[in-house]
Amino acid sequence: MSHAIVVSQHGNPDVLRWQPRPLPVPAAGQVRVKVTCTGVNFADVQARRGGYDAGGALPFVPGLDAVGVIDQLGGGVTELQVGQRVACFPAGGSYATHVTAPAHMIYPLGDSVSDESAAALTMLVTAWNTLHQAARLQPGETVLIHAAAGGVGHLAVQLARLAGAARIVAVVGSAARADFVRSLGADEVIERQHEDFAAAVNTLTGGSGADVILDSIGGDVTERGLTCLAPLGRLVIFGHASGKPAHITTPTLHRQGKAVIGYSTGNLRKLRPECLRPSVEVVWAALETNQLKVHIGAEFALADAALAHQWIESGQGNGKVLLRPD
């Protein structure tokens, strides 16, 4: 017998229900993983609310990534073995004691990568790919990172520093979070409740603007971001936490060669899964050498996923939130 968090109707965190279900059986080309921990992503919150397409049709199991030990192989799987520690992108949701995943979505873990760090798989890949694949960050450039104390944001700050960014400007929601992102390598910190981030960036850069902007907010944050994006700059949108659309006029882009780029790790999983493995290998190496650290902001029992969602929605924590089946 297995257990999972199931969403049968959209709504507040109380719709996250702990339910028994049959132990999943891996199909050909899949493996089954006994989960030791799974991460909470903001996309899970949006899926629960019904404002994001990640959840699919009701009912569904939330969650994008999981870490655990392989306990059964499906037919035709020869490159993996029972007992192997892995991170994975499951075929279904990850808020479960057992998940199945395609073999090509399984990423073995070395002894020096902890389960807790690996549970940030989606965030790690997103932070790396937004900076390097989407934005094509170059040494010496200025980077602006929204929600810099959050799961993706705190990793992006560190990765931008490793990539040789000349200046990292972090946008956060409180003074406590400002100290946190400075400790990760941010050069300048803007508290969004007290400052106009676009005006502050233009002042800090002498009017030249940021070369790269990572935007998980959308709406007017995207619109204002274009006013502090440097000529030939790249604004990468990888989320829409505001739930609001942005209105962009094309003259804003072509006259100064500014680019707005969309990015989704979920979309890569579906359409170009082979593109993910190189990114995973890079972030695994950075974790193994302690060049990159995943900050665990809070941990909850998997059965208490509702409390984890409440914690995230409170907007008070930093870093990654974990769920543990035990």
Indicate residue ranges for each PLM-predicted region.
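C-terminal capping/lid region of NAD(P)-dependent oxidoreductase domains
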Residues: 284, 289-298, 306-326
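NAD(P)H cofactor-binding loop motif with strongest signal on the N-terminal glycine-rich segment
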Residues: 147-148, 217, 240
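Glycine-rich beta-strand-centered segment in the early N-terminal region that forms part
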Residues: 22-40, 51-93
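Mid-domain Rossmann-like dinucleotide-binding core that forms the NAD(H)/NADP(H) cofactor-binding site
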Residues: 81, 119-194
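Short amphipathic alpha-helix with an adjacent loop that forms part of the alpha/beta core around
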Residues: 196-207
